[in-house]
Every structure is written in C-alpha cells, then in structure tokens.
C-alpha cells in the first residue's frame, strides 16, 4: 500500500528534525527542479506576487528563496520533507512523534507530491520554497506545472508502487496535486478516502477538518501497516467512523458528528 499526500505552504526549517539512525535521501528529480528555479528567478517580487496571488512580504521571501536554492542538497541547506512541511495535513500526521519503525515504513509506503520537486520520499532533503502545483507558470513544456511534469510524476509513482509490493494506491492528496498524476497510466487500484463532518445536521466536506483527517489517515497507515482496503475501513482517529452505505468500491467515506 502506497499513500500520497500534498505538500504544505507552511514550512519549518528552524526546528531540528528527529534524530534517526538512517540517512536522509536525495530528491530524485532536482534536474527538473533546477529548470523551474531558473524560470522563477526571473520574476521580480511584484511579478511573483501577481503570479502566485501572495502578499508583497511573501513574494519578497520567495524571490529570496529562489535566489538561494542550490542544486546540491545537504544537511546545512535542507531538511527532510516529512519534518519540513507544516500545515493542516501535517498537524494530523504529527510526524515528530513517529517511531523509528514507523518512519522506516513511511520511506517505502508514503510519497509527497510537490510543484517544485515532483515527488518526494519522506526523508528526501528539500530546501525552502513555495510553488503550488496549480501555479500557471509558463515553461518550455506548456502553460503550467501540469504540462511541465507531464508523465514524470506518474512514472516515478509507478516505480514506488512496484517497490512497495502491491497495487493499492491511497490518494490522500488534494485535487490540485492529484491533477499531476495520470491514474490511467498507473497499474494500481486507487482508493480515495473522503472525510465528511456534520454541520447543522448535514455531512459535508469542511476543508480544514478534511485536511487534518487526511494526515490522521496517513498516521493510521504508518501505525497499523494495513495490507488490504478492508483494513483501511477500521480508521477511527479523531472520532471518524466508516460509513459503508455511503462508500463505494474505491471511495471510502468516513463521517464525524458535529463537534460540541
């Protein structure tokens, strides 16, 4: 079973990563990352702010990040992706409290999609950046990052699928990031967990809760190491429960009553 998740806009490069006795890994697709960096370096703060719809302060920060980005990734300029991303998904995942065995399992069974890096293993080193997959960054391959990455992410995802040993892919990424995957080109049964929260008597997807729940589902996978879709249905973290009637063969619906 392989799970995929989105990255996060919020990053933490100040807090030291937990110390495990295995080495961090090198991101595989940095030759492509360098091409994107070279394009992004050409933007002024105002141009980048307009492209990314971000504040002047964030635009200036990311112009500096693009200028400082280096092809070589080491312990001084980088941090393992699993511990660098901080956002709602990663709050639910709570990577800092994973055991050594769970992190080892994650190295094989978890991947992060990325606008800049394409596909990251949990312990791949990464440098601070902001480049969302939906950014309309014109490049030699087309009008946006979906055109830039083409089949590359899908091919590397297939390699990861082959290495981990079965054909179950658990899609816990946002639609924006999953759009960079070409499911028809994957030899995989793709399972999509959906998390619904009760609001005024009706169950609906609430972005903040759904993101956190996706992280909790990753945590559940790393802790329980399920080998079948049936075992995923046992997920009950955060008071969610599996709704058999609302689910289908590849869409697993989890619900939670309104929080008091």
Swiss-Prot record:
Q: Which Pfam families match?
A: H2O2_YaaD (PF03883)
Q: Which InterPro entries match?
A: YaaA
Q: Which GO terms describe its cellular component?
A: cytosol
**What processes does the entry annotate via GO biological process terms?**
response to hydroperoxide
Tell me its family.
Belongs to the UPF0246 family.
PANTHER family (UniProt xref) = PEROXIDE STRESS RESISTANCE PROTEIN YAAA, PEROXIDE STRESS RESPONSE PROTEIN YAAA
Q: What is this protein called?
A: UPF0246 protein APL_0602
């Amino acid at each position: 079973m392989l799970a995929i998740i989105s990255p996060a806009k919020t990053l933490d490069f100040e807090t030291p990563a937990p110390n495990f006795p295995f080495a961090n890994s090198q991101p595989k697709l940095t030759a492509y990352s360098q091409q994107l960096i070279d394009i992004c370096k050409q933007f002024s703060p105002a141009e980048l702010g307009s492209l990314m719809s971000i504040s002047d302060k964030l635009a200036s920060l990311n112009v500096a990040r693009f200028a400082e980005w280096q092809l070589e990734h080491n312990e001084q300029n980088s941090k393992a992706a699993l511990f660098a991303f901080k956002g709602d998904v990663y709050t639910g995942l709570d990577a800092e409290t994973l055991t050594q065995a769970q992190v080892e399992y994650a190295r094989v069974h978890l991947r992060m999609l990325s606008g800049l890096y394409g596909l990251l293993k949990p312990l791949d080193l990464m440098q601070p950046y902001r480049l969302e997959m939906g950014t309309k960054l014109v490049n030699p391959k087309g009008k946006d990052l979906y055109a830039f990455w083409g089949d590359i992410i899908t091919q590397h995802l297939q390699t990861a699928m082959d290495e981990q040993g079965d054909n179950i892919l658990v899609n816990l990424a946002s639609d924006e990031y999953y759009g960079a995957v070409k499911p028809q080109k994957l030899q995989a049964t793709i399972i999509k967990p959906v998390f619904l929260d009760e609001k005024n008597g009706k169950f609906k997807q609430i972005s903040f809760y759904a993101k956190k729940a996706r992280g909790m589902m990753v945590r559940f996978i790393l802790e329980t190491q399920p080998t079948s879709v049936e075992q995923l249905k046992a997920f009950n973290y955060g008071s969610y429960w599996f709704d058999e009637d609302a689910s289908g063969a590849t869409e697993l619906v989890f619900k939670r009553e309104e929080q008091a």
